[in-house]
A protein has these predicted regions:
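Active-site catalytic microenvironments for nucleophilic, acid-base chemistry
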Residues: 26-31, 63, 83, 109
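Noncatalytic regulatory segments and standalone regulatory/sensor domains
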Residues: 47, 109-308
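N-terminal intrinsically disordered, low-complexity regulatory tails that precede a folded domain
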Residues: 1-6, 34-42, 58, 62, ...
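Active-site-adjacent substructure of cysteine-protease-like catalytic cores
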Residues: 43, 69-125
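A structured, charge-rich N-terminal accessory region that forms the first stable segment of a protein
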Residues: 6-50
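Short, solvent-exposed, low-complexity loop/linker segments
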Residues: 46, 50-79
């Protein structure tokens, strides 16, 4: 398997043959499971020449406690209805598009628009109309009939065997937000935000007496976090800290995570420690109490914009 595949977030595939593992990775991420694409590629036995077929993806899905449910329709409208049914249940769906040559993930249907994750795009998340998705999805079965072949629509729903306590809600508005250039870092490091937030927050539950959304929690405590982290670090700005807190709120609300009111003090301490560690990694820290300190990391160079698809 090729080198250069790495774990977190929404980022483009580095080659032409790993779209299948990336599509399954994005489906698992929507179900709250963070799996390295290398693990999926290894389990599926993805090959540089032939890529990954549906049998290999099904094997990988089973290894991560999911089943691929195959649905086939010959009528476009019937195919759309089946796709929408799964998406309304918040079950991510894999489609093989471009005449069965490329895997994508569909996460949501909203007013005949569909939220799609395509690992050859950058940014990966996009919104497609039904005619756009239909034309991309349909497959002419020339293996069956060469002249005037039948048109087929195949989908594979990623059905979890495990109890899903959190599921992502990638609405059209959320995808538009993530596609902004200034939010590229958030998209690329999505897993890191989610992993940390799952330690601080809880999935929504009727057993939580006083659940606080991250928005409400930050309304009460953000000013304290801003002032104390900025004061103690000394070389980080309020705007920079505020941006990280905004990103945390965005990820938290995408999965519907909450903070029990009884755990507010602990959550506040966790966030203060987490933001302080981030500030040190971003800007370094001077020596203190006899330690040598750490140098600030150099500012990353601006990347050139690329036109077209990878």
């Amino acid at each position: 398997m090729a080198e250069g595949l790495f774990g977190p977030g929404f980022y483009p595939q580095p080659n032409e043959w790993t779209c299948g593992p990336f599509a399954l990775k994005h489906a698992l991420l929507a179900l709250g499971r963070m799996v390295d694409v290398n693990q999926i590629s290894s389990t599926a036995r993805t090959h540089w020449w032939s890529g990954t077929n549906e049998i290999q993806l099904a094997r990988a899905a089973r290894a991560f406690e999911c089943d691929l449910v195959l649905e086939r329709r010959a009528d476009a409208e019937q195919a759309r209805k089946v796709l929408v049914k799964y998406l309304r249940e918040q079950t991510p769906v894999l489609l093989c598009v471009d005449e069965w040559s490329h895997w994508i993930t569909v996460l949501r249907a909203e007013d005949r628009r569909f939220v799609v994750v395509d690992s050859t795009d950058d940014p990966l998340l996009s919104v497609r109309t039904w005619p756009q998705l239909r034309n991309w999805w349909r497959y002419h079965d020339t293996d069956y009939v060469k002249d005037n072949p039948p048109v087929l629509y195949d989908l594979m729903a990623v059905a979890p065997r495990f109890r899903t306590t959190v599921k992502a809600d990638f609405s059209v508005d959320r995808v538009k937000f993530l596609r902004r250039p200034e939010n590229r870092r958030l998209a690329h490091h999505w897993n890191e935000y989610l992993e940390d937030l799952l330690e601080i927050c809880k999935p929504p539950s009727v057993r939580i007496a006083e659940p606080l959304s991250m928005g409400e929690f930050l309304r009460r405590h953000q000013e304290l976090l801003l002032t104390r982290v900025v004061y103690w670090h000394g070389d980080i700005s309020r705007d920079e800290v505020g941006r990280v807190l905004r990103d945390m709120r965005f990820v938290s609300e995408t999965y519907g995570l909450v903070i029990p009111a009884s755990m507010s003090r602990r959550a506040l301490a966790d966030l203060a420690i987490l933001i302080s560690i981030w500030a040190c990694s971003q800007r370094g820290v001077d020596g203190m109490f006899g330690s040598p300190g750490a140098d600030a990391r150099p500012e990353p160079k601006a990347s050139r914009k690329r036109n077209g698809r990878r």
